[in-house]
């Protein structure tokens, strides 16, 4: 047993020694790989020429055998040369970037930016072309792309004008400004005037604009004439535009007038309201004219009319009551007669005649509904003085004492 235990003892140290010897080997490989990786990245980025890098890095290989002596020495002494090499590479990079900046042009600001701008130079040109295409396709006011303040005109000054000419004269750009012009005209005078001023210097779509303006002005004049025949102009009279005003200002004033007429058109029936109550005056005056004489025929006719009409007569009576003040202005004397004991004039309100004394009393004062008018009516005085009148009911006026 002891021998068996003693046998593996000499075998134990080698596995313990192997992990001790492996870490320095791994470190040496990782540092070399790191150096190779750094050199490859710097050469690939263009900071260091590959020829110089290949000549410089073999010198570092001489330090690799030294690492076999001790791990601590290799870490302490090899770190400084590697740092120096990285610093030298960055210095070379800065010098090369300065040279490239001088060669490329004075517009590019700093050394690091110059290298990136050198790498991105073709991308910037393509971006400018894409921006130009986007402006020509998606901008509402197409010809503004060719304005002197646009970035495309500043960057592409060397290009001939023929290359930029097709952009503002495309069909989509001609149709879109007209739509925008219509929208601005509908919005108000400020937007339309400002947009018209901006669009004046453009020569190409001028003829189309003039034609559209002439057509619009003709349509507006025709509409105005039709409206003038149909409705009188409400409100105070408007002064005609002066001769010094431009065509755009005249069109804006016409649009304002049209909008005002459309807005006032909703309130036009207000002044016409007095006319409906004036229509039923003739049947009402028939009752009032029959008030002074003592004929029972007028009373019977009025009562039968109100009873037969029903709802129509009630609605007319309500309209008469509501428009009492308007109807009082008429010059008919019967409207000013005061026969009811409420001491108020006839004023077009429905009245009923007493079958005994012949006095006319308002239906509202007699507490009689317009839909239920009796054939024989007795006023309050007759009821108080002659209680037998109520019993007799249909006492004729000829039998009155």
UniProtKB/Swiss-Prot annotation:
Subcellular location(s) of the protein: Nucleus; Cytoplasm
Lineage top rank: taxon: Eukaryota
Keyword annotations: Acetylation, Autophagy, Cytoplasm, Metal-binding, Nucleus, Phosphoprotein, Ubl conjugation pathway, Zinc, Zinc-finger
GO cellular component, as recorded: cytosol; nucleoplasm
Biased composition range(s): Low complexity: 147-161
Biased amino acid composition, Polar residues: 303-316
Ranges annotated as PHD-type zinc finger: 337-385
Biological process, per Gene Ontology: autophagy; negative regulation of autophagosome assembly; negative regulation of autophagosome maturation; positive regulation of protein ubiquitination
SUPFAM superfamilies the UniProt entry points to: FYVE/PHD zinc finger
GO terms assigned for molecular function: zinc ion binding
N-acetylmethionine, modified sites: 1
Family matches, as InterPro entries: Znf_FYVE_PHD, Znf_PHD, Znf_PHD-finger, Znf_RING/FYVE/PHD
Compositional bias annotation for Acidic residues: 244-262
Bias-annotated ranges (Basic residues): 92-101, 177-186, 212-224
SMART domains per record: PHD
Oligomeric and partner information: Interacts with LRSAM1.
Function: Acts as a negative regulator of autophagy, through promoting ubiquitination and degradation of LRSAM1, an E3 ubiquitin ligase that promotes autophagy in response to starvation or infecting bacteria.
PANTHER family: HISTONE-LYSINE N-METHYLTRANSFERASE SET-26-RELATED, PHD FINGER PROTEIN 23
Family: Belongs to the PHF23 family.
Domain-related comment: The PHD-type zinc-finger domain is required for interaction with LRSAM1 and negative regulation of autophagy.
Protein name, entry field: PHD finger protein 23
Species annotation: Mus musculus
Taxonomic classification: Eukaryota, Metazoa, Chordata, Craniata, Vertebrata
């Amino acid at each position: 047993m002891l021998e068996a235990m003693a046998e593996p003892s000499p075998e134990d140290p080698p596995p313990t020694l192997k992990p001790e010897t492996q870490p320095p080997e791994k470190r040496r490989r990782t540092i070399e790989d790191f150096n190779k990786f750094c050199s490859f990245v710097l050469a690939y980025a263009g900071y260091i020429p590959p020829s110089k890098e290949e000549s410089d890095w073999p010198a570092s290989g001489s330090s690799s055998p030294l690492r076999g002596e001790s791990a601590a020495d290799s870490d302490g002494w090899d770190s400084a040369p590697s740092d120096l090499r990285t610093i030298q590479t960055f210095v070379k990079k800065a010098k090369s970037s300065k040279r490239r900046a001088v060669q490329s042009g004075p517009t590019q600001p700093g050394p690091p930016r110059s290298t990136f701008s050198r790498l991105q130079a073709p991308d910037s040109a393509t971006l400018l072309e894409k921006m130009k295409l986007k402006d020509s396709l998606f901008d509402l006011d197409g010809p503004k792309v060719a304005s002197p303040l646009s970035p495309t005109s500043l960057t592409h000054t060397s290009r001939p004008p023929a290359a930029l000419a097709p952009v503002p004269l495309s069909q989509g750009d001609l149709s879109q400004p007209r739509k925008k012009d219509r929208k601005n005209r509908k919005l108000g005078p400020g937007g339309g005037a400002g947009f018209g001023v901006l669009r004046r210097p453009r020569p190409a779509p001028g003829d189309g604009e003039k034609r559209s303006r002439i057509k619009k002005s003709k349509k507006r004049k025709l509409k105005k004439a039709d409206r003038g025949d149909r409705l009188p102009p409400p409100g105070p009279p408007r002064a005609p535009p002066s001769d010094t005003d431009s065509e755009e200002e005249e069109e804006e004033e016409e649009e304002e007038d049209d909008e005002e007429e459309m807005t006032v058109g909703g309130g036009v029936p207000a002044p016409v309201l007095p006319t409906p109550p004036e229509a039923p005056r003739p049947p009402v005056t028939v009752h009032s004219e029959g008030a002074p004489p003592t004929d029972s025929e007028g009373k019977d006719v009025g009562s039968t009319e109100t009873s037969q009409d029903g709802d129509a007569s009630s609605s007319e009576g309500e309209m008469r009551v509501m428009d009492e003040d308007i109807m009082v202005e008429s010059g008919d004397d019967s409207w000013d007669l005061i026969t009811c004991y409420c001491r108020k004039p006839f004023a077009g309100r429905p009245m009923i005649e007493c079958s005994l004394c012949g006095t006319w009393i308002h239906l509202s004062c007699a507490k009689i509904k317009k839909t239920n008018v009796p054939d024989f009516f007795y006023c309050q005085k007759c009821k108080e003085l002659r209680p037998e009148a109520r019993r007799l009911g249909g006492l004729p006026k000829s039998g009155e004492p």
